[in-house]
């Protein structure tokens, strides 16, 4: 319960990692607490799904930052930036979308069953 409380109290920073990390923590913490703060969790999932579209690049993937691909990965420069998709943003937002859809449960839209959370 404390982890769910903590995750819901923190405002989401909408970049690839923070977006997904928030949902990931809630998803795993609520496995045995399905009804705990359920409405707030559903609200958070919807908020994340709606915001993820701000990072979607038409005809491509997702940009890690709003209107900017990731410039550095840890200490290495990986691009000059720009409003384009990048592999890290696409991977993290795809995972975040899957988790958000799972958190919606019965409220998930039709077609969400095709989004899978695959553990490797």
Features from the language model and the residues they span:
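Terminal, non-catalytic domain-edge segments
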Residues: 1-120
């Amino acid at each position: 319960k404390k982890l769910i409380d903590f995750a819901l109290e923190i405002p989401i920073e909408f970049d690839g990692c923070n977006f997904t990390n928030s949902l990931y923590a809630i998803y795993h913490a609520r496995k045995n607490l399905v009804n705990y703060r359920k409405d707030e969790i559903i609200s958070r999932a919807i908020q994340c799904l709606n915001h993820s579209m701000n990072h979607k690049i038409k005809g491509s993937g997702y940009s890690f930052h709003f209107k900017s691909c990731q410039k550095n990965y840890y200490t290495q420069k990986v691009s000059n930036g720009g409003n384009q998709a990048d592999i890290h943003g696409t991977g993290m937002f795809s995972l975040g979308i899957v988790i958000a859809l799972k958190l919606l449960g019965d409220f998930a839209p039709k077609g969400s069953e095709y989004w899978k959370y695959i553990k490797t």
